[in-house]
Amino acid sequence: GYWQYENPELQVLGQTIGAGELDDLGQTLYRGEFDSLEQRNDIYRTMTAAGLDESVRVWLATVDNSFPALDSLTGLTRDLVAGPRNPWALREAYVEGSGDVRVGHQWVWTERTTYNPVGGLGDVYAVDLWRNLSDPTLWNDAFTGIPQPFRASYEVETAGPEDTLEVPADAVTWDVESKAWVPVPAGTTAVSKVIFDYSDYLGANWHHGQPITLADAVYSIAQGMELAYDPEKVRIETAIAVTSRPILETFKGYRLTEDDRLEVYVDYWHFDEDHIGAYASPVGFDMPWELKAAMDELVFEERRAAYSDTAASRFSVPWISLVLERDANLVDRTLRKLAREETVPAALADFGGRTLATPEEAAARYEAAREWFDEKEHLVISQGPFYL
């Protein structure tokens, strides 16, 4: 199963849950394969009851956290679930008459604190900092939990749950065999279309001074497909491939409009259209594309590091963390190699007839990242209001 666990046959709420069906129900929710709010709630009830019945293996927990703060701290947004662990908290908090807000944490770093956007950023000591270094495209409203625009806006068009939309013939998808964007097959359909407007990113700068472009979003989309479907990469980063493939299977195509908006076509429906927008949102603007390209080269071609802890352990290489000078130095060497070879990733050379990065732009990116490393001795680069 998805969680490397398969439940036995269960009797839950007067109905039989077949062997392995708990896994199927979870993916049904994950992919939005329900026709109404009522059906979705029934699935939740069934899964909760089954989870309690199987609680030796399926962990259910209610967590209470406390976050002490001085009375002088003002403007702190408190999420109904996560408390101050939200992107607005430290962006808006202040102490009257002071230009500083001092925040303490139990640890700055542990053995599990790993700064890489593919298989890291998994513990609070990294995430609590990262949340203030990087602007997300969307985020759940602190008071309702409903997804909303943060630095990207979107429009949703859906034919679900019972009908489909035609995917335009000039939409593309990534082909892992040819390493190129190819037109979607004739007659391709999707349940929903989401149009993303990245105007608040484009033209602004990454922390190292280079302008944010659509190349950063597009590289991430291709990278995700490579990790999930390229046989050699799947062999190396198996855990990432297995967990990402179920959602990627529902993405049917991508298309750039003349005004630089990105259309995403997905087989996904939800009774709240904001959830469709959140589901379809591609990861793209967390780190600049040249860092991801260098890490891909380091992990899959040079085999001198790994994205995940499981791959790092299996192949006896570092679990790459860009905050550590040792690991950042490995990436810096690879950046130097990419610059020397004048590399422009295939994913950026031709996207539906558009070139998203020229050799000159790529060279400037490699140089800026290396200069950042020379100055900061790490490669944690993003685009939020604070930098590391």
Where are the predicted features?
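Primarily extracytoplasmic ectodomains and periplasmic/lumenal surface modules that are beta-strand-rich
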Residues: 109-112, 205, 269-273
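Aromatic- and charge-enriched surface segment that lines or borders ligand/interaction sites
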Residues: 165-232, 264
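Extended Gly/Ser/Thr-rich low-complexity repeat segments
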Residues: 208-211, 216, 273-298
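Short, solvent-exposed loop/turn and secondary-structure capping segments
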Residues: 72-73, 114-118, 208-210, 229-232, ...
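Ordered hydrophobic segments in well-structured contexts
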Residues: 57-59, 193-195, 252-255, 261-266, ...
